[in-house]
Each structure stands twice: as C-alpha cells, then as structure tokens.
Amino acid sequence: MARRLILGYQSYLSPLKMGPTCRFEPTCSNYALIAISRHGLIKGSVLALGRLARCGPWHPGGWDPVPPRRPLCSWGGRRR
C-alpha cells in the first residue's frame, strides 16, 4: 500500500512541479521506496519522514543514501 502511494505520487503529482525540486540524491520519494523495502514499513517510514524533515532550503542536500540494514545480533554470537 505504501509503495503504491509513493509510486502514485511519482507518476501523477511530482511531474506537476516545475522541474526537479528535491535537493537530495536519491530523491525523497526514491529514498522512501528504498527505505521501506530495506527496513520494512515501520522503520522505513520513520527513515523517510526523517529525510523529509531534512529536505528544505536550510539544508544543502547532496548524496544521502538509505542506511544499510543492520544484523539483529551485533555482537556476532552467543554470550558466554
């Protein structure tokens, strides 16, 4: 459902703007698609909302990739 909403935005609303307006690469909508597919709906949506909060004239923009997925077990094994 979230993916369809983002794709709908990209197909129907985004072209109505005069030229590219996102100051980031990947664009905020592509970032949201990647974040949701990589991290799941909840964490991906939180990451996408954080990106949207940074997307404004006060931020220089630039390359801002979706962070990699971290393993559930960061210490690599069973505790002894």
Swiss-Prot record:
Keyword Chloroplast in record: no
Keywords: Cell membrane, Membrane
Cellular compartment(s): Cell membrane
InterPro entries in the record: Membr_insert_effic_factor_YidD
Keyword match Membrane: yes
Bilayer topology term: Peripheral membrane protein
GO cellular component: plasma membrane
Function: Could be involved in insertion of integral membrane proteins into the membrane.
Family: Belongs to the UPF0161 family.
NCBIfam families hit by this protein: membrane protein insertion efficiency factor YidD
The protein's name in its UniProt record: Putative membrane protein insertion efficiency factor
Origin species: Corynebacterium jeikeium (strain K411)
